[in-house]
Design a protein with these regions (language model features):
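CBM-like carbohydrate-recognition segments
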Residues: 27-69, 81-118, 124-128, 132-137, ...
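Bacterial N-terminal signal peptides that target proteins for export
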Residues: 1-11
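Extended ligand-binding clefts on enzyme/binding-domain cores
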Residues: 156-157, 167-279, 286-297, 309-343, ...
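Residue-level detector of functionally pivotal "anchor" positions at catalytic/ligand-binding pockets or at interdomain
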Residues: 385-400
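Asp-box/WD-like beta-propeller blade repeats and closely related beta-sheet repeat scaffolds
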Residues: 133-166
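Bacterial N-terminal signal peptides
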Residues: 10-19
Length: 400
């Protein structure tokens, strides 16, 4: 009898795990996805009713630094699938408040972090082509296009901060010089920064910067592939491919690397849908982390939606990741837990928890909104053509 009871217990436990697993892979409705995105977004908009107010932490920073710029990428993605004027007005007020300039350094800055806000400036220009919205970020990038230096992106986060800007300008102005410079900067990061580049062609993942390429290893002897860093890269590739013409130079390089990265992410996804902060070492501060996971869900869902990732495993992984974020990280009031604070490696901001806020609450939300926007499409949601049209080339002002 005892043996029979044990078998029943095992069967019940197995059935429970199966039910949990199926729930994790159950596609939410488009309406539920929008609802969760709205709640998360409203939390930040309530906290920052004036989007131009500086961020005050250990020092005062303008509100168009990279952390907030990443949020606005997500907000514009939300606007695409849930076109409320409140979102558009909030973004325009932000851009106008910063005079449509980079965060620091004016048009002379080559720092990708300073330039990241330009992604949203350009998207707002594409909705309403007022020249002031694009002039300064274009002048900033034009200086880099006309320079012979290609080593500006020495950390992989930079790829997401700046690559889409070059791609957007190349598409708007139909000028391949932006695509060529984009490739030169990207390829230097991939193959030359550090000892042999920051990309491992065997594992199809990236070291965050030269401090983490071999011989550096995690405490358990593994390569340290930081989750959010790789999330930045996957997001960069998706956002570049999203606007690049099919015949743009070097497009195939980005497609190949995107697919290789996506394939590498599948076997290391956690059962709860998240990815560990150290992708190859679950013992190095292992646990749920929202920002990297959000970027991965965005990339995977985007790849499925655009026909680059055709195997069912990618769709399942995206659903599993999104459900993990919503079920385990999103609070009823819109706060997102398990967001790792700013940094460059798995140990930064540890330990993480459901209730612990990151030092900046904006970029994690940006990842969540980007992910949700593609999950909305994956779930069968329809996007209004008038909003989709902002990706279409408009009459451009003066060329490069």
């Amino acid at each position: 009898v005892g043996h029979s009871k044990f078998q029943c217990a095992v069967c019940f436990a197995g059935l429970l795990l199966l039910i949990i697993g199926l729930r994790a892979q159950e596609m939410p409705t488009p309406e539920k996805i929008i609802e969760d995105m709205r709640v998360a977004n409203q939390y930040l908009m309530n906290k920052w009713p004036d989007p131009t107010v500086p961020t005050v932490k250990d020092k005062v920073r303008p509100s168009n630094i990279w952390t907030r710029a990443a949020y606005y990428e997500g907000l514009m993605a939300l606007y695409r699938v849930d076109p409320q004027e409140t979102y558009y007005d909030y973004a325009v007020q932000w851009g106008e408040g910063h005079n449509w300039e980079p965060a620091y350094g004016g048009t002379r800055t080559t720092d990708a972090d300073n330039q990241c806000c330009g992604q949203t400036y350009i998207e707002l220009y594409q909705i309403d082509p007022k020249p002031e919205r694009i002039e300064k970020i274009k002048a900033t990038i034009d200086r880099m296009v006309n320079s012979d230096e290609n080593d500006a992106w020495s950390w992989i986060d930079a790829l997401q901060m700046a690559m889409p800007i070059f791609a957007k300008l190349g598409a708007i102005y139909q000028d391949n010089r932006y695509f060529e410079k984009l490739y030169s900067l990207y390829y230097f990061t991939k193959t030359q920064h550090g000892d042999n580049g920051l990309y491992n062609p065997e594992d199809h993942l990236w070291w965050r910067d030269k401090d983490f390429d071999p011989p550096y290893t995690s405490p358990n002897g593994e390569d340290t592939y930081w989750s959010r860093g790789n999330g930045w890269v996957l997001t960069a590739l998706a956002r570049v491919l999203d606007v690049m013409p099919e015949d743009a130079p070097h497009r195939e390089e980005y497609v190949t690397t995107f697919k290789d990265m996506a394939e590498a992410l599948i076997p290391i996804q956690r059962e709860d849908g998240f990815w560990n902060v150290s992708l190859h070492d679950p013992e190095e501060f292992g646990g749920k982390e929202t920002s990297g996971t959000g970027f991965f869900v965005f990339g995977l869902a985007w790849g499925v939606n655009h026909g680059l990732l055709t195997d069912e495993i990618y769709k399942i992984a995206a659903i599993k990741g999104w459900n993990g974020l919503v079920n385990d990280a999103l609070h009823e009031n819109g706060f997102l837990g398990y967001v790792q604070s700013t940094g460059k490696q798995p140990s930064d901001g540890q330990p993480l928890s459901y209730d612990k806020p990151a030092n900046f609450e904006d970029y994690g939300l940006g990842a969540f909104l980007l992910a949700g926007s593609e999950m909305f499409v994956l779930a069968g949601g329809s996007v209004q053509s008038s909003i989709e049209g902002r990706h279409i080339d408009l009459t451009a002002p003066e060329r490069l």
